[in-house]
């Protein structure tokens, strides 16, 4: 058997290809960013063709960096930014429109009307999700209704939908020449279109959005030896390599953090934050603003479910300090600047740029800086930004404990923001529990590799994967209970100030 597993990690801001050995160690990687297209306020798009070109480049360059060829790979996995919606012509591979990104809020009227009509309760019961701009169903509906010719093309079988996992998979396996149009249960569970109990597209839900069933990819387990086909030799690997694992990014990170037992949780800090709690084979329906989702499904085994708290803006708030406010030149400088003050100076920053996700689900919210005094400066804003990342995670942890009665003993963390040591210390202080960062920080790509390797026998069992995990650093809480309570009370007041800011239109 070949000695390595590859993983495509198609993210919100970049695409990377990583190669791992039997010990789960990184052997080689390459990463490229892609353009963030912002045509209007609240609209966020990506160019699907650019994403596919970046995927080609990173796969070729990672192999070159490692001195490897495609034949050295036993299999590859794919992980991706979830919910981001691509609709393309399967005859040509040409997208009908840019990919509408998960952060995009143009479908707020669609979501509001679903709620007003009472259909929101059906979506929650069947799909485990609230009607929100976040998910794919409304984005597909928007394209069908607003892009000329797409509705007619869909009815004729000439327009298909996929999240970026399906888009990359279809292209890797041949594109117009027999490419496989498929997805996995984790990505499908983020569309508002899949029934969590049947793991199939639900005709009633499809009817809510007016989506023809023929547009949709086949739903497969997250790890399977045959369901996703093989790469074409004409494609970037120049070899026929089995594609045996596909998971949405947060599900992949859950696998990469080896959260295989009920009650185990991880928090990924990236563009947004995503806290996922494994609930086992039990489907737990949230009563406190969380999402019920599929954590993963390996082969023919029953699906494992999870509760998730999705936060739209965390790491991207630091990017805002850099790109819009220009008070730092690099994201890493946020830590240095924030360390020059002892606290937030009474100032709170709620980065509700596109509304608030879990546990509030308020598309009418917008960002706010409150408690501002003449005393405050850029350092206080940097500190308040890091605290906002951590307070939003506390909101989710509180909801998770209410839904599951599970009290976290430690929070496992991963993602780019975890390189910010001050932010992780603040997180431990705000939660009052230790925060643990693993040695291998690229848990999203690693999880996709694990899913692919389990399907091929590269790794035998999840217990073997547990032996790969080790802690790099742990942060212990340092705040007093009084400071923790006062700080959180101030945060909750600040959140209240952001609500009812935007009138959600009726379609």
Swiss-Prot record:
Q: What is its EC number?
A: 2.7.1.30
- The superkingdom of the source organism is Bacteria
Binding annotation for sn-glycerol 3-phosphate: 12, 82-83, 134, 249
Molecular function (GO) terms for this protein are: ATP binding; glycerol kinase activity
Q: How is its activity regulated?
A: Inhibited by fructose 1,6-bisphosphate (FBP).
Annotated binding of ATP, by residue: 12-14, 271, 315, 319, 416
Key words, A-Z? ATP-binding, Glycerol metabolism, Kinase, Nucleotide-binding, Transferase
Q: Which cysteines are joined by disulfide bonds?
A: none
Q: Name one GO cellular component term.
A: cytosol
Q: Which residues bind glycerol?
A: 82-83, 134, 249-250
Reactions performed catalytically: glycerol + ATP = sn-glycerol 3-phosphate + ADP + H(+)
> What Pfam families does this protein map onto?
FGGY_C, FGGY_N
Query: Which InterPro entries does the UniProt record give?
Result: ATPase_NBD (IPR043129), Carb_kinase_FGGY (IPR000577), Carb_kinase_FGGY_CS (IPR018483), FGGY_C (IPR018485), FGGY_N (IPR018484), Glycerol_kin (IPR005999)
- Where do the annotations place ADP binding? 12, 16, 271, 315, 416, 420
Which GO terms of type biological process are on file? glycerol catabolic process; glycerol metabolic process; glycerol-3-phosphate metabolic process
- The broad enzyme category this protein falls into is transferase
Give the metabolic or biological pathway: Polyol metabolism; glycerol degradation via glycerol kinase pathway; sn-glycerol 3-phosphate from glycerol: step 1/1
What is the documented function of this protein? Key enzyme in the regulation of glycerol uptake and metabolism. Catalyzes the phosphorylation of glycerol to yield sn-glycerol 3-phosphate.
Report the sequence similarity comment from the record: Belongs to the FGGY kinase family.
Name recorded for this polypeptide: Glycerol kinase 1
Q: What's the source species for this entry?
A: Streptomyces coelicolor (strain ATCC BAA-471 / A3(2) / M145)
């Amino acid at each position: 058997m070949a000695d390595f597993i590859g993983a495509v990690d198609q993210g919100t801001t970049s695409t990377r290809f990583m190669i791992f050995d039997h010990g789960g160690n990184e052997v080689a990687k390459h990463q490229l960013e892609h353009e963030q297209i912002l045509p209007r306020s609240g609209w966020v798009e990506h160019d699907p063709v650019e994403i596919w070109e970046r995927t080609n480049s990173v796969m070729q360059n990672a192999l070159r960096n490692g001195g490897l060829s495609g034949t050295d790979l036993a299999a590859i996995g794919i992980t991706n930014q979830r919910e981001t919606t691509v609709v393309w012509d399967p005859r040509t591979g040409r997208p009908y429109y840019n990919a509408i990104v998960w952060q995009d809020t143009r479908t707020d009227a669609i979501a509001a009307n679903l709620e007003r009509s009472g259909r929101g309760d059906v979506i929650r019961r069947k799909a485990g999700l609230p009607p929100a701009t976040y998910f794919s169903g409304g984005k597909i509906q928007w394209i069908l209704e607003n892009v000329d010719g797409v509705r007619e093309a869909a009815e004729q079988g000439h327009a298909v939908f996929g999240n970026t996992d399906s888009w990359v998979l279809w292209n890797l396996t041949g594109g117009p020449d027999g490419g496989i149009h498929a997805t996995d249960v984790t990505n499908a569970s983020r569309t508002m279109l899949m029934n969590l109990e049947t793991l199939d597209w639900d005709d009633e839900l499809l009817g809510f959005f007016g989506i023809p069933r023929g547009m949709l990819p086949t739903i497969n387990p997250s790890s399977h030896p045959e369901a996703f086909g093989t790469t074409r030799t004409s494609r970037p690997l120049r070899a026929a390599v089995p594609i045996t694992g596909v998971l949405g990014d947060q599900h992949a990170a859950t696998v990469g953090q080896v959260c295989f037992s009920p009650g185990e949780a991880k928090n990924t800090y990236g563009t947004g934050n995503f806290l996922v709690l494994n609930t086992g084979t039990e489907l737990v329906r949230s009563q406190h603003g969380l999402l019920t989702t599929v954590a993963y499904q390996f082969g023919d085994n029953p699906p494992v479910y999870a509760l998730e708290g999705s936060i739209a803006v965390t790491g991207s708030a630091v990017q805002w300090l850099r790109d819009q406010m220009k008070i730092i030149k690099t994201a890493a400088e946020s830590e240095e600047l924030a360390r020059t003050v002892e606290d937030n100076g009474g100032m709170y920053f709620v980065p509700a740029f596109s509304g608030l996700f879990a546990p509030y689900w308020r598309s009418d919210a917008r960002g706010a800086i409150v408690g501002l005094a003449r005393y405050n400066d850029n350092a206080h804003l940097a500190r308040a930004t890091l605290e906002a990342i951590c307070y939003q995670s506390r909101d989710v942890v509180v909801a998770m404990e209410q839904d599951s009665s599970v009290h976290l003993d430690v929070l496992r963390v991963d993602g780019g923001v975890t390189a910010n040591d001050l932010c992780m210390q603040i997180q431990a202080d705000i939660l009052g529990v230790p925060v643990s960062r693993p040695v291998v920080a690229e848990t999203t790509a690693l999880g996709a590799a694990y899913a692919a390797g389990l399907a091929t026998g590269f790794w035998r069992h999840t217990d073997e994967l547990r032996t790969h995990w080790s802690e790099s650093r742990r942060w212990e809480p340092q705040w007093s209970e009084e400071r923790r309570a006062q700080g959180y009370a101030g945060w909750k007041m600040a959140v209240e100030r952001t609500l009812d800011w935007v009138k959600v239109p009726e379609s």
